[in-house]
């Protein structure tokens, strides 16, 4: 199987799945589906209250800096490679960029809870 055949099969299957995904959903809109659900009980208050943007920003910041672990996980296996200088410089650049991002976030008071 050559590359063109594999590409055509993948594109065809992807398009078929996208078309099926748009055709299958039922368009029955029930009001119960839009209501909030709290462990089987009626909500005590309004579930549509706005939340603090600080929580959202801290969550996004956590996700961005949590990628550091995912990117540095292969580091012990990469040490066994022949190109250790390239691997160490790449890891150093990655950690430096993340440290600069943390310093910028700190200086912009993105980690402060009080306003």
UniProtKB/Swiss-Prot annotation:
Keywords: Electron transport, Membrane, Mitochondrion, Mitochondrion inner membrane, NAD, Respiratory chain, Translocase, Transmembrane, Transmembrane helix, Transport, Ubiquinone. It is a multi-pass membrane protein. It is found in: Mitochondrion inner membrane. One of its GO terms (biological process) is mitochondrial electron transport, NADH to ubiquinone. Pfam families: Oxidored_q4 (PF00507). Its EC number is 7.1.1.2. Gene3D superfamilies: NADH:ubiquinone/plastoquinone oxidoreductase, chain 3. GO terms for cellular component: mitochondrial inner membrane; NADH dehydrogenase complex. It is an enzyme of class 7 (translocase). It catalyses: a ubiquinone + NADH + 5 H(+)(in) = a ubiquinol + NAD(+) + 4 H(+)(out). InterPro entries: NADH_UbQ/plastoQ_OxRdtase_su3, NDAH_ubi_oxred_su3_sf. Core subunit of the mitochondrial membrane respiratory chain NADH dehydrogenase (Complex I) which catalyzes electron transfer from NADH through the respiratory chain, using ubiquinone as an electron acceptor. Essential for the catalytic activity of complex I. PANTHER family: NADH-UBIQUINONE OXIDOREDUCTASE CHAIN 3. This is NADH-ubiquinone oxidoreductase chain 3. It comes from Peromyscus polionotus. The gene is MT-ND3.
